[in-house]
């Protein structure tokens, strides 16, 4: 399969690109240049690997979920344990890389957006480590849902700005973070939390997250002497999925499954299934699939999981859908909750609600596969942050 994206203009087929105001163009080009240099610099790679190993705690285990496998029948189920990273999710793979890049570029301050608070915590963490000033924008609805993470960020020295505009969720936080970056561009680096935004952000985030898929490949081959038949990951903006899928893109014998949030159901208005129900448009500097109405107004995304309710999806996922290399599906709030409880009871592992969407789809897929086949789930984060809202949800039901 001939797959080499993005092109030199930052496009993934028709997707991606750089739809930014003139005031940001220079910074985006400067970032691209700095990133290219860093990727070719052995000292930078060495420093990044040092922190990934000694600070983040990589590599993360590939765990054979024996009880889940027995329960489902069919394929052997493996979990890539990104929940065991420092700060409890995959987000830090990207924030540590971008923070080192910020230091290299001589920036003193970092700005970021966050939905579930995981990216905010991971950003505040690396800023504390590297002595960078940190400002985090978070929608007020998410601030309410994720009180604990807000306090965590503040403990780490970050300034958390609550965003009341729009629906007070991730999309609005990104708007404000971009606005802040425009006016502080001389001394500030924007750490984008997912494979979104203008080029080179989708590529930078994908590359820093690719450590997930690279490790998985190596670990699975060591255990089973072959590649897995299927790989499953959840998708909001799509960074854990992109990090897991990208190293497998050329291995056409490996089926890749991306799982979006169907919320209350894709037939309702309350979902975040962008690739299932969306259409092409431009948001936050990039062309991609979006949830929008006929007039092109962005629709509110809904999911029980704060990390999946973004109304767009990364440009590379948009392309992978169109060329059929990845097959995209969606899982409802209720199905995700069921999977959350099942994994907790069967394996003693409490997954994030985001990751529970991937688990739920894998539960449907595994029984249709053969016993000598393998399925890997990207367990993108741990569920401590969700226990309170799950308790509330179950009491209401």
UniProtKB/Swiss-Prot annotation:
Per the UniProt record, one Pfam family is PALP
Q: Which cofactor does it need?
A: pyridoxal 5'-phosphate
Recorded GO cellular component terms are: cytoplasm
Q: Which InterPro entries match?
A: Trp_synth_b_CS, Trp_synth_beta, Trp_synth_beta/beta-like, TrpB-like_PALP, TrpB-like_PALP_sf
Would you say which domain of life the source belongs to?
Bacteria
Q: What pathway or pathways are given for this protein in its record?
A: Amino-acid biosynthesis; L-tryptophan biosynthesis; L-tryptophan from chorismate: step 5/5
Query: Molecular function (GO) terms listed?
Result: tryptophan synthase activity
**Enzyme Commission code(s) on record:** 4.2.1.20
- What is catalysed by this protein? (1S,2R)-1-C-(indol-3-yl)glycerol 3-phosphate + L-serine = D-glyceraldehyde 3-phosphate + L-tryptophan + H2O
Q: Residues where N6-(pyridoxal phosphate)lysine occurs?
A: 91
Q: Which PROSITE patterns match?
A: TRP_SYNTHASE_BETA (PS00168)
Per UniProt, which keywords does this protein have?
Amino-acid biosynthesis, Aromatic amino acid biosynthesis, Lyase, Pyridoxal phosphate, Tryptophan biosynthesis
Class of this enzyme: lyase
Spell out the family assignment given in the record's similarity comment: Belongs to the TrpB family.
Quote the function comment for this protein. The beta subunit is responsible for the synthesis of L-tryptophan from indole and L-serine.
Q: Which HAMAP family match?
A: Trp_synth_beta
Q: How does it assemble?
A: Tetramer of two alpha and two beta chains.
Known PANTHER family for this protein? TRYPTOPHAN SYNTHASE, TRYPTOPHAN SYNTHASE-RELATED
What is the protein's given name? Tryptophan synthase beta chain
Q: What is the lineage of its organism?
A: Bacteria, Bacillati, Bacillota, Bacilli, Bacillales
């Amino acid at each position: 399969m001939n797959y080499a994206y993005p092109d030199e203009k930052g496009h993934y087929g028709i997707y991606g690109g750089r739809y930014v105001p003139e005031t940001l163009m220079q910074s985006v080009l400067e970032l691209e240049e700095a990133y290219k240099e860093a990727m070719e610099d052995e000292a930078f790679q060495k420093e990044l690997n040092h922190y990934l190993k000694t600070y983040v705690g990589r590599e993360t285990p590939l765990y054979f979920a024996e009880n889940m496998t027995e329960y489902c029948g069919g394929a052997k189920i493996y979990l890539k344990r990104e929940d065991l990273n420092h700060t409890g999710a995959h987000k830090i793979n990207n924030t540590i890389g971008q923070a080192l890049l910020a230091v290299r570029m001589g920036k003193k301050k970092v700005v970021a957006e966050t939905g579930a608070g995981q990216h905010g915590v991971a950003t505040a963490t690396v800023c504390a480590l590297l002595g960078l000033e940190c400002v985090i924008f978070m929608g007020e609805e998410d601030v309410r849902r994720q009180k604990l993470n807000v306090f965590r960020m503040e403990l780490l020295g970050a300034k958390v700005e609550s965003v009341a505009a729009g629906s007070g969720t991730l999309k609005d936080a990104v708007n404000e973070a971009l606005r802040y970056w425009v006016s502080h561009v001389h001394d500030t680096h924007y750490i984008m939390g997912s494979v979104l935004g203008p080029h080179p952000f989708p590529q930078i985030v994908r590359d820093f997250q690719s450590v997930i898929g690279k490790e998985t490949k190596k670990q699975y081959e060591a255990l089973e002497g072959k590649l897995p038949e299927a790989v499953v990951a959840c998708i909001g903006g799509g960074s854990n999925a992109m990090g897991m899928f990208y190293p497998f893109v050329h291995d056409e014998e490996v089926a890749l499954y991306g799982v979006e949030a169907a919320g209350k159901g894709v037939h309702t208005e309350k979902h975040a299934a962008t690739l299932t129900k969306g259409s092409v448009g431009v948001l936050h500097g990039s062309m991609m699939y979006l949830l929008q109405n006929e007039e092109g107004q962005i629709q509110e995304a809904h999911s029980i999981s704060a990390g999946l309710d973004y109304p767009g999806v990364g440009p590379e996922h948009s392309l992978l859908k169109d060329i059929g290399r990845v097959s995209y599906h969606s899982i409802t709030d209720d199905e995700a909750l069921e999977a959350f409880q099942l994994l907790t009871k069967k394996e003693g592992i409490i997954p994030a609600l985001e990751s529970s969407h991937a688990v739920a789809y894998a539960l449907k897929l595994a029984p249709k596969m053969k016993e000598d086949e393998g399925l890997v789930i990207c367990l993108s984060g741990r569920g401590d942050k969700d226990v309170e809202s799950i308790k509330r949800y179950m009491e209401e039901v």
